[in-house]
Swiss-Prot record:
Releases the supercoiling and torsional tension of DNA introduced during the DNA replication and transcription by transiently cleaving and rejoining one strand of the DNA duplex. Introduces a single-strand break via transesterification at a target site in duplex DNA. The scissile phosphodiester is attacked by the catalytic tyrosine of the enzyme, resulting in the formation of a DNA-(5'-phosphotyrosyl)-enzyme intermediate and the expulsion of a 3'-OH DNA strand. The free DNA strand than undergoes passage around the unbroken strand thus removing DNA supercoils. Residues 854-866 have a biased composition (Basic and acidic residues). Residues 165-585 form the Topo IA-type catalytic domain. Its cofactor is Mg(2+). Its EC number is 5.6.2.1. This is DNA topoisomerase 3-beta. SMART domains: TOP1Ac, TOP1Bc, TOPRIM. Mg(2+) 2 binds at residues 114, 116. One of its GO terms (biological process) is DNA recombination.
Length: 866
């Protein structure tokens, strides 16, 4: 029997490319969690049956056990020594189960994951999921190394299989554990400490990250240079001569002086002389070197500065171009091509695009030059176009990025730009002036990269010893100016220089400081720190500057590199780094008042923030509504904070009082045409009076997700109070046909009356011709749903003889059922004799038990967010 070879790629599109190349297009495909492509072929000299499938990035993520996920019940200090576990990144995708099923009965496993450290780490995740022992590496388990998804590269990789690198996989494990524990410990402490104290502190999570925070530190450092800058006046001489009827300005060798009187003295000396003597003429042949190969960091910098595309977006576009086979692997630190690289084939693939066809054909006909010797990081060749694309196929931004990659590659194999530089030196009154002219003799690579062209300017011809009359000598007055805010491109350069992040993670860190509201991206993609970002960095600086300096992260990256090279034990590195951060965390906690003083100076206390909105059920005084994230109410008298649902609007709801606690109800409205609106009691929402409600409703809350703060859980549509007219008991109509929830009458949806599910996004549109719709205390004898009363408009009533009032069950009453419409769900069938009732939130019971038991215990705060 022929052996079975399971091959696993990182993305479905790459799996398809691999299968197509190895099978010659003769394969069958069947559906699974990801597609499985099957074909017959040869493996290690024997006939074999191949199965090619894929994961979708990382299969497993590192996290804390459930016992450590409660923000209130866990001391952040304990996280440094807490165990970590690996759970499936996306349980709904069922990748783990898929790999285990496909691996059954397989003889060999070939790993086609991306060829970087993350890819090596995913290799071992895949091995764990398949159940094949790690001891089989080299016998049954192999690794394919490739830099593009072209047929040639795939065939070469298949013919030269290697082994996955355990050391590189362990290096990623070490970084993940360090970033998780350090980031979550600091984040939980400072978020809990500062949230709820200040009303205009606009942030749900005040996060810390070993990479994220030094990245922010660079932005704040530039901001501080700008705010502390003091302009200073300066003066310079502008000397002019007339040649062939043209006025020519000469540059003063002293550039500028900061003493006006001295500048005036030099002006008088030159003016009194009246003649400029040509003392030297220099003519040199200069060369502007072609660029080396393109690596990830340089691509991101150009995308931001020249194309206006942010690093995160640029990386996503580059990855898409790679998976579609248009470019080589986009995550590389190398700028040097291997000696065996086939430049002629790469150029020939681009010859038919009219934008650069002339340049390419010239290079192919007259000969191209090899790129400059760059840096060889030993990972992947520089980013290179692999096949021709069109703007229509890629879309605007992807095309612009692809176009630059093509132009850069063509530039690397083009000749250098050559030009003649002429410099003429003049003297007068003991002062020296000069003028410089450039004349391009060979455009070289700048013909394909015109933005790098040498500026040409012709200067008049003079001979040494010529005496030239001075036309005028002016004094120019100016002031020094502060530096501009850091651009994304400049920030990326600083991160690379200081060892912050990797070519793969740099875009994530830059994006995170924007997402966390620490900086804002202004015109020119310049990063302006917010008050929160500035105050955080100033706080770290006054407690422990190491927390926001790049030195620690640089040290960590160096240690992780040693692990990847097999020169350091990953457990010892993790233990050593965490011990250092434990000491810093302990000191930070003791000195947090220093940071708090800065927050107090920048932000307003809750008592001074917000507007009066609703009455407190405890003291009967009006509470203040704080609209900044996270939205909340604050009772000045009781000094209590009540968190509210986020990402919507809040207003008082008809001055209705909750019968359980005396608080005034609020109406929360989500955003969007089909979004829900629902009433809630602030106290019940934060402290659900019925057991299990907070778990039933997947609202955000501090002790589970760290997104909102304390508590959150029970709007009125989940309340089980038997007589309250806003509760699920009185407003619930029937079980949701899509999930285990209950359809609730939307109290403010008139005139477009509707029901919405209290668990999923299912919406049922009720008769629009109704003047009023309300629930009754009657039950349908057939299905036990609540009978509703509909008051139709007189002009549009469907009832006989102009009647307007009608009672019925929306499931069993033929008239009402014909007038309702289902949205965001499956078809809504009439029920006959099922007798399941409304379910009181349980809907169809055990038939959807698995969906109903979904948990919301994702704290995540994992390393990817820091």
């Amino acid at each position: 029997m022929a052996p079975t070879v399971l091959m696993v790629a990182e993305k479905p599109s790459i799996a398809l490319s691999i299968a197509s190349a190895l099978s010659g297009g003769r394969m069958s495909t069947r559906k699974g969690s990801t597609d499985v492509h099957e074909f017959d072929g040869m493996f290690q000299g024997s006939h074999a049956f191949f199965k090619v499938t894929s994961v979708i990035g990382h299969v497993l993520s590192v996290d804390f056990p459930p016992a450590y996920q409660n923000w209130e019940g866990t001391d952040p200090m304990d996280l440094f020594v807490a165990p970590v576990l690996r759970s499936e990144c996306n349980p709904k995708a069922h990748i783990r189960r898929h790999l285990a099923q496909e691996a059954r009965g397989c003889t060999y496993l070939v790993l086609w994951l991306d060829c970087d450290r993350e890819g090596e780490n995913i290799c071992y995740e895949v091995i764990d999921c398949t159940g094949i022992p790690k001891s089989e590496v080299g016998r049954r388990i192999f690794r394919a190394k490739f830099s593009s998804v072209t047929e040639k590269d795939i065939m070469d990789a298949m013919n030269n299989l290697v082994l996955p690198s355990k050391d590189e996989a362990l290096a990623v494990d070490a970084r993940q554990e360090i970033d998780l524990k350090v980031g979550v410990a600091f984040t939980r402490f400072q978020t809990r400490y500062f949230q709820g104290k200040y009303g205009n502190l606009d942030s749900r999570v005040i996060s810390y990250g070993p990479c994220q925070t030094p990245t922010l530190g660079f932005c704040v450092q530039r901001y501080q240079q700008i705010t502390t800058f003091k302009p200073e006046k300066f003066w310079s001489l502008k000397t002019y001569v007339i040649k062939d009827g043209n006025e020519i300005q000469l540059e003063w060798d002293r550039k500028k002086l900061f003493d006006f009187d001295v500048t005036v003295m030099f002006q008088k000396m030159v003016a009194s002389d009246g003649i400029l003597k040509v003392t030297d003429i220099s003519v040199k042949e200069e060369c502007k070197a072609r660029p080396p190969g393109l690596n990830t960091v340089n691509l991101l910098k150009v995308a931001s500065s020249a194309l206006g595309i942010g690093p995160q977006t640029a990386m996503h576009l580059a990855e898409r171009l790679y998976t579609q086979g248009f470019i080589s692997y986009p995550r590389t630190e190398s700028t040097a091509y291997p000696s065996s690289f086939d430049f002629r084939s790469a150029l020939a693939a681009l010859a038919h695009n009219p934008l650069w066809s002339n340049d390419v054909r010239t290079l192919l006909d007259t000969g191209f030059v090899k790129p400059k010797q760059g840096h060889d990081a030993g990972d992947h060749p520089p980013i290179t176009p692999m096949r021709l694309a069109t703007e229509e196929a890629l879309g605007t931004d992807a095309w612009r990025l692809y176009q630059y990659i093509c132009q850069h590659f063509i530039g690397t194999v083009s000749p250098d730009c050559r030009y003649t530089r002429t410099s003429i030196e003049f003297t007068s009154g003991g002062e020296t002036f000069h003028c410089v002219g450039n004349r391009v003799t060979s455009k070289g690579f700048t013909s394909i990269m015109p933005w790098l062209a040498v500026s040409e300017n012709n200067i008049p011809a003079y001979k040494k010893g010529d005496a030239v009359s001075i036309h005028k000598v002016d004094i120019y007055e100016g002031s020094t100016t502060p530096p501009d805010y850091l651009s994304e491109s400049e920030l990326i350069s600083l991160m690379e220089k200081n060892g912050i992040g990797t070519d793969a993670s740099i875009p994530v860190h830059v994006n995170n400081i924007c997402e966390r509201n620490y900086v804002q991206v202004n015109s020119g993609r310049r990063l302006v720190p917010t008050p929160l970002g500035t105050t955080l960095i100033r706080g770290y600086q006054c407690i422990d500057a190491d927390l926001c300096l790049p030195d620690i992260r640089r040290f960590i990256e160096q240690q992780i590199t040693l692990i990847a090279k097999g020169e350091a034990d990953h457990l010892q590195v993790v233990q050593h780094v965490l011990q250092q951060f434990m000491k810093k965390y302990s000191y930070f906690v003791k000195k947090i008042e220093n940071m708090d003083a800065l927050f107090e100076a920048q932000f307003s206390p809750l008592a001074d923030s917000g507007r009066l909105l609703s009455k407190c059920g405890k003291c009967a005084r009006y509470m203040k509504y704080i609209s900044t994230q996270p939205m909340r109410l604050y009772c000045v008298t009781c000094e209590e904070v009540y968190y509210l649902p986020q990402n919507g609007s809040i207003k008082l709801y008809k001055e209705i009082i909750c019968p359980l606690d005396g608080f005034e109800l609020l109406l929360f409205s989500m955003v969007g045409p089909d979004a829900k609106s629902f009433p809630l009691c602030p106290f019940c929402y934060n402290s659900p009076p019925f057991e299990g409600i907070d778990k039933l409703f997947g609202a955000l809350k501090l002790d589970d997700t760290g997104k909102v703060g304390k508590g959150a859980g029970m709007p009125c549509f989940l309340c089980l109070h038997p007589t309250c007219k806003q509760s699920m008991i009185t407003q619930g109509v029937c079980a949701c046909p899509e999930c285990t929830g209950t359809l609730i009458l939307d109290p403010v949806s008139a005139p477009k009356w509707r029901l919405y599910c209290n668990r999923c996004n299912c919406i049922v549109l009720l008769p629009h011709a109704a003047h009023k719709i309300s629930t009754t205390d009657k039950k349908c004898p057939t299905c036990e749903s609540t009978i509703i009363e509909v008051d139709f408009n007189k002009k549009t009533t469907p009832l006989k003889d102009g009647a307007t009032l009608h009672e019925g069950c929306i499931l069993c009453d033929e008239l009402l059922h014909s007038l309702i419409e289902m949205k965001h769900g499956k078809s809504f069938f009439m029920r006959r004799g099922r007798g399941r009732g409304r379910g009181r939130g349980r809907g169809r019971g055990s038939s959807r038990g698995r969906r109903g038991s979904s948990r919301h215990d994702d704290p995540k705060m994992s390393f990817r967010d820091f």
